[in-house]
Amino acid sequence: MQQAPEAMTLKVIAHIHTAFPTKFGIPRQSGLVEELRGEIIFTSEYRNPDALRGLEDFSHIWLVWQFSGAVRENWSPTVRPPRLGGNTRVGVFATRSPFRPNPLGLSSVKLEAIEQRPDVGPVLIVRGADLMDGTPIYDIKPYIPYADCHPDAAEGFTGQTRTHHLEVFCPEALWQTVPEADRAALQGVLASDPRPSYQHDPQRVYGMEFAGLEVHFTVDGAQLTVRDITLL
């Protein structure tokens, strides 16, 4: 049997375009904010519609992608998950941290549509992605419920730190500055508490970029208050 090489070259097959130009505010996992819309545009080499034949019959897909916004040359065998307060160390392979030997991410997203565009070929319209704008995609696979869903799976430390939801208050005048098509997604992102898990100062004003807007907010207890929204 031929021995497999110790290293391989991955080819970027596509890039995803989302509402997040920076890492701050991106949901901690895919599917938490299904209103988030993304577009996957293939590189010129992989714009052959035949490669997507049959994919329209699946409701969800897996994306294999690169943590392009958090690349490090070195990796650590242990990391400190933000969901544990940033103080407890856990083995890197027991987390989804980007600081791993191969900085690859895996996300399950809803496949809403496949569009054919004359300038870029087939485009996948997805919902619920937890990726930064421009993230390179290395592979796409169909989500297969009977094989991929494990209702009785143990969830480790994540079961102790489930994502909580905040009540979002935004003055109507500010809310009207948000395009109607983006409001539900922004509401979902804010409700899922985009702050780092270890920051709880009610006086601190946080800022995040979303869909061409800069949103400033504070969080006091279980309520998030939008303080300002400006056009970038």
Positions of the model-derived regions?
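Mixed-charge, low-complexity intrinsically disordered regions
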Residues: 1-104, 116-125, 129-232
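Conserved positions in beta-strands of structured domains
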Residues: 17, 109-112
